[in-house]
């Protein structure tokens, strides 16, 4: 019985392990790292001011671009219509605390103008997630 237990506890080495990639993406021993998952939801601003709404949404998209370029935002995208009024998600990397994340979120015009609100959750996922970003900029035909 003791031998079976020690075999089950043995870690299997990855023959494809690349230390430089693991370091580049700040992976732990399991190829994972901590992120913040932000769920964007409909905010309290019900204004019909189309100019303010358009300006806020343009600022929202510009802010997404800036945060991606700064290496903080890894994933951003809208959600389909749902009963919880969830509008989209963000996944952030390299942000030290929820307080610092909330300061970053406060730079988003749609959040600042209360068209969007948010919920924040710590998330543990693949450290390779940011690796898709260079490809994503090469496959779109129309800029949002």
Can you say where each PLM-predicted feature lies in the sequence?
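Conserved, structured core segments of small domains
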Residues: 9-144
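N-terminal signal peptide c-region/cleavage motif recognized by signal peptidases
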Residues: 3-5
């Amino acid at each position: 019985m003791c031998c079976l237990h020690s075999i089950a506890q043995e870690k299997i080495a990855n023959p494809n392990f690349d230390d430089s990639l693991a370091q580049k993406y700040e992976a732990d021993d399991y190829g994972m790292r901590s992120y913040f998952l932000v769920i964007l939801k409909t905010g309290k601003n019900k204004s019909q001011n189309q100019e303010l709404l358009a300006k806020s949404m343009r600022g929202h998209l510009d802010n997404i671009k800036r945060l991606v370029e700064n290496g903080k935002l890894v994933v951003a995208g809208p959600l389909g219509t749902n009963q919880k009024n969830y509008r989209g998600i963000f996944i952030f990397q390299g942000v030290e605390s929820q307080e610092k994340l909330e300061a970053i979120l406060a730079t988003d015009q749609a959040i600042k103008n209360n068209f969007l609100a948010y919920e924040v959750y710590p998330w543990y996922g693949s450290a390779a997630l940011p690796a898709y970003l260079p490809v994503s900029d090469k496959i779109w035909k129309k800029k949002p």
